């Protein structure tokens, strides 16, 4: 077993963490220096300027003391405002330096909650003064760059409980205006979006208008795939609304979902379902469709249930997918399977795994059983069914059977259908590996109108012994002629792969220039990502990295380098990935914050996957190195890095792995306390409770009570 425990041999990597002490921090903003640094009028004392973090810690301490004294909200709030003014006017603390701090998050949330409690009639302290409203307090936080997601959430909830949806919508607009000035918090943003969605449902009810997903997505400024549907239902149930209001909102939410499912089926299937990989969301939406859309699946051609079947199968839930047929029958006695649904079932069974020597035969038998029993027996086989059969055979890996089916079973008039012939040709060019170009040439159509097919042909040519001239000729004819197809990122990546073989070492040449891109083009990063997906070996990846000669100080360098980090870590070459990371850190020694979340996420995720696939706890020690470095550079750990670390520890704990004393110390005294801190700040929500459940199986790991 490979062990990667930190040792003297690897001290250069450990040095990444210790080196951070010597890395100069970002230059302090000089806006408050010079002419802005004021001295008091003649005869008064000069005030000493203090650091923003010191100022915020002072505010936090004062607020905490006021809460311990059980002072009323109005008194605490007034003193808080006075203290802020003093910091700004006398000690010259610029509020814009508060933007990225989380020091006061929890105590500021407590002030809003106390004002809410007092307004609800719960007397606190000795004063009977009228407390400030939560919104009034939030406005002050916004003024001084202290507002965070959790503060918006508290006020939004209060507006909804008070049945003030218009005020909630106005607050959402304010949130959008200030979101870029707050630390990144995807969990908090999702919750704010969910609460805003509830406000929209309330307004729809008030105006007697049917809720519409298109209107909601315009309001939230996101695509339907980003709407937090799960959170919306959970928030409706947990807000503490009256039973009547809650039931009305749940009914409106059901109407919203049904409208989304059925108003524009093509958009739901092609723009959302085919592009989403969120298994939890898709499973939830299927259950909702089954509950709400009886009329749709008993009167239509059932394209939506079929699309759910295929998507679940693609997400490795093929057994759940085939159960959909039974669920539909149980949901309504009026349900009768359509040919369209059987076409989807064909593709679904192709995803079901099979094992043993007869695995391929088993897969083929399943497909043929559906074809013969439900489609061929109907006597009228449509183009859609031939298409589904071809795709099912390709999914199952029966490339030779595709050839025989095409030759013996597909009628000539169907073969003439461009959609069908494109599928057949894609199968042919995708299945051939490193053959002579002469074997491909006769199959290449004179005109290609399908982008996916064109890319498949181009890649097959690159893998063959086709000359540079042959490849350039096909590329020019297919993509650069007046009637040509517009190339996508994958097209450019394949052409880049072809050009790389003939690329010289001249510093005057640019490898990206050979495909018409500049080094700083936004498309360049996407093309590099696609290149690494089609890259057949590490030598090609390294050749591209060398040819790119990435400037690690450029604006988009982190995106590019993180793609290579992902690639090398996925292929097990973590040593080279660390070399790239260390070089990036060295090149940015004067601005270490340039080593951003993308790079750290890549390292944490890569080590997480390696720890699991190799069952080696030593990679947790690697995560510790980057945890310490990230903390020193950014004063925080990015959420994805936290998740990757928890995933490692969870999987290894489930396998009864033995952690070293150093690793246990890291888990118990660094990772878990940090998770508690995030929970208190409401800046992170652990979506998979199994992580902690698995960790509990190790009696040397102590889960804090706050996380149980």
Curated annotation (Swiss-Prot):
It comes from the Eukaryota. Residues 19-44 are annotated as: Disordered. The keyword Transit peptide applies. It is found in: Mitochondrion. Residues 1-15 form a transit peptide. Keywords: DNA recombination, Meiosis, Mitochondrion, Transit peptide. InterPro entries: TPR-like_helical_dom_sf. Coiled coil: none annotated. May be involved in the control of meiotic sister-chromatid recombination. This is Meiotic sister-chromatid recombination protein 6, mitochondrial. It comes from Kluyveromyces lactis (strain ATCC 8585 / CBS 2359 / DSM 70799 / NBRC 1267 / NRRL Y-1140 / WM37). The gene is MSC6.
